[in-house]
Amino acid sequence: MRIGVLAMQGAFREHIQSLEALGVQGVEIRHANQLEGIAGLIIPGGESTTIGKLMVEFNLLEPVRHLAEGGLPVFGTCAGMVLLARDIIGSDQPRLGLMNARVQRNAFGRQVDSFEVDLEIPVLGEEPFHAVFIRAPYIEEIEPPAEALATFKDKIVMVRQGNLLATAFHPELTKDLRVHSYFLKMIG
């Protein structure tokens, strides 16, 4: 199984390392022709406005949207969550707009306000997940069929909608592989 990782910006190498630790091949995606044959796609963190513009410039936005609408599992972390959201508060930036979610960018503050916290994520089991938040967004509101999987201070920080998964935090920056494993189970 090959999982694509959008390699425009952010911790794409760390996502690939997490996939490889689970015995799955992760491949860097920079052009639309590289999407062929992947079983899923990860959109890493970074700066969502920049990633969105690069996806337009490199002709990736529409092909990724088309594949996801056709059922390709897509997992967005931090900026990837912003790009998956239908609504981004105060922004008209390019986005995939696939998830019934309204997102606030950089909601927990600036880079200096980054933090780590143990989250209760029932779909991952009883043990808390140590989450790393860096200039993180949160989801202010969702509509069905989107479903909240984790919250922090009453803000949604992990959500699933069918073949789409998104986290406000960076699971690739920890040794805990449960979020990546959950995504792989979504793929089947």
From Swiss-Prot:
GO molecular-function terms, A-Z: glutaminase activity; pyridoxal 5'-phosphate synthase (glutamine hydrolysing) activity
InterPro entries the record matches: Class_I_gatase-like, PdxT/SNO, PdxT/SNO_CS
Keyword Nucleus belongs to the record: no
Active-site residues per Swiss-Prot or TrEMBL entry: 78, 170, 172
Record: residues binding L-glutamine: 46-48, 105, 134-135
Functional pathway: Cofactor biosynthesis; pyridoxal 5'-phosphate biosynthesis
EC number of the protein: 4.3.3.6, 3.5.1.2
Keyword field: Glutamine amidotransferase, Hydrolase, Lyase, Pyridoxal phosphate
A single GO BP: pyridoxal phosphate biosynthetic process
Catalytic reactions on record: aldehydo-D-ribose 5-phosphate + D-glyceraldehyde 3-phosphate + L-glutamine = pyridoxal 5'-phosphate + L-glutamate + phosphate + 3 H2O + H(+); L-glutamine + H2O = L-glutamate + NH4(+)
CC terms in the record's Gene Ontology section: cytosol; glutaminase complex
Name of the protein described by the UniProt record: Pyridoxal 5'-phosphate synthase subunit PdxT
Species the sequence originates in: Moorella thermoacetica (strain ATCC 39073 / JCM 9320)
